[in-house]
Amino acid sequence: QTLLQELPIPP
């Protein structure tokens, strides 16, 4: 798992 996968990233 990675933080980028966990955090909601805006497009």
UniProtKB/Swiss-Prot annotation:
It is found in: Secreted. It comes from the Eukaryota. The modification Pyrrolidone carboxylic acid is found at Q1. Coiled coil: none annotated. One of its GO terms (biological process) is defense response. This is Bradykinin-potentiating peptide Pb. The keyword Secreted applies. Its main location: secreted. Expressed by the parotoid glands. It comes from Phyllomedusa burmeisteri. Keywords: Amphibian defense peptide, Pyrrolidone carboxylic acid, Secreted.
